[in-house]
């Protein structure tokens, strides 16, 4: 091996080491090949829980949940409860050591058998936009809505059907109106 070849190998090794360290600082101290799913800090702070995180906790390779200490406990508490139910360890890490907007990850102890290309979850709001549903559908999470709009949710976004309830006859008697109908003029 010539001196030039040796220097190239040293440079490649150095680049790999630097990339690995940069990767770990982005993913809360973990290598990307161990990450099953990731949420941004903004997503963790939303009122709704992400189904993808709950499903990732059920993955046989999932061993722990790591979250940024910058996230208020009131927002991370529900994920901690789900992790405990799934018998997944959890820990918080100090945000000073890491850069980027990663707020929560579900990881394996080893590299995943089937690597995930994009570990980041699409925001719920963006999912509604992709289905061409008005943002009032998203804003009406955990509210009672009319039968028509509940049917739309069941057809277009079945994974979120349990986030809504149907307005009952009694609710209508007391003047309750569907927030989606009010916004869209239905």
For the regions a language model picked out, list residue spans one by one.
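Ser/Thr/Gly-rich flexible loops in soluble cytosolic domains mediating phosphotransfer, phosphorylation
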Residues: 3-4, 16, 115-148
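Short, compositionally biased "basic patch" segments
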Residues: 1-47
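Short basic, glycine-rich beta-strand/loop surfaces that mediate nucleic-acid
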Residues: 82-134
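Acidic, metal-coordinating catalytic cores used for nucleic-acid/nucleotide bond scission
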Residues: 69-75
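Short, surface-exposed connector motifs at secondary-structure boundaries
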Residues: 58-65
């Amino acid at each position: 091996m010539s001196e030039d070849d040796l220097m190239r190998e040293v440079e490649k090794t150095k680049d790999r080491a630097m990339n690995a360290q940069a990767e770990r600082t982005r993913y809360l101290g973990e290598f990307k090949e161990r990450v099953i799913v990731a949420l941004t800090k903004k997503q963790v702070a939303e009122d709704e829980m992400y189904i993808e995180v709950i499903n990732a906790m059920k993955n046989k390779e999932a061993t722990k949940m790591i979250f940024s200490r910058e996230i208020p406990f009131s927002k991370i508490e529900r994920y901690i409860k789900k992790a405990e139910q799934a018998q997944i360890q959890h820990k918080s890490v100090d945000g000073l050591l890491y850069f980027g907007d990663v707020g929560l990850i579900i990881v394996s102890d080893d590299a995943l058998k089937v690597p995930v290309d994009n570990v980041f979850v699409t925001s719920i709001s963006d999912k509604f936009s992709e289905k061409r549903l008005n943002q009032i559908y998203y804003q009406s999470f955990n509210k009672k809505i009319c039968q028509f709009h509940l049917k739309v949710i069941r057809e277009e976004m079945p994974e979120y059907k349990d986030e809504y309830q149907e307005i009952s006859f009694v609710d209508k008697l007391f003047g309750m109106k569907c927030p989606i109908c009010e916004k869209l003029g239905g």
